[in-house]
């Protein structure tokens, strides 16, 4: 059975949103930068997290392409229309198998996407993190992104 891995909340002012969540009593991690141009701050829970994310206007963001879901372009385009919950990530034991299943079910035909980066834990210590993502789309909810996240 899957569980919610994390919720992606798109915001124009990343530090302002982080400040709000901190004032609400959450521990908000430091700013991270993805190689595809987005920046985030994480609010970690035991088995899930909230990802506050933004797409700086000067970011070099790869475009969508056949078979390729551009995470950065999705966030940028979402923020041109609104702020809020932009994506729902479900847990995965095998993102490659998820991508195959999504294609068979007609809800995604995207190559899995893998990336690694250095992150910081809430206590400030450095950690290495790696993710494999499989993306799906819902034509009934085109402004909401769905993906599975294998960590």
Where are the regions that the model predicts?
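Residue-identity detector for glycine
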Residues: 16, 25, 29, 37, ...
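Vicinal oxygen chelate
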Residues: 3-12, 41-46, 49-51, 63-151
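Short, solvent-exposed coil/turn segments
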Residues: 2-4, 36-38, 142
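Glycine/small-residue-rich interface belts in oligomeric ring/scaffold proteins
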Residues: 19-77
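Short, extreme N-terminal leader segments that mark the start of a protein/domain
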Residues: 1-30
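Generic structural motif
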Residues: 12-14, 48, 55-57, 93-95, ...
């Amino acid at each position: 059975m899957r569980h919610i891995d994390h919720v992606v909340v798109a915001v124009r002012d990343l530090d302002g949103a982080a400040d709000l969540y901190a004032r609400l009593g959450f521990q908000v991690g430091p700013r991270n930068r993805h190689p595809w141009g987005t920046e985030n701050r994480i609010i970690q829970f035991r088995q899930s997290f909230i990802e506050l994310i933004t797409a700086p206007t000067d970011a070099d963001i790869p475009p969508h392409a056949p078979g390729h879901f551009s995470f950065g372009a999705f966030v940028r385009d979402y923020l041109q229309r609104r702020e809020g919950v932009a994506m729902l990530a479900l847990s995965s034991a095998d993102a490659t198998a998820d991508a195959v299943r999504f294609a068979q079910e007609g809800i995604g035909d995207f190559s899995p996407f893998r990336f690694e980066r250095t992150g910081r834990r809430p206590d400030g210590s450095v950690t290495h993190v790696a993710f494999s993502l499989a993306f799906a789309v819902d034509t009934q909810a085109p402004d909401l992104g769905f993906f599975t996240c294998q960590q």
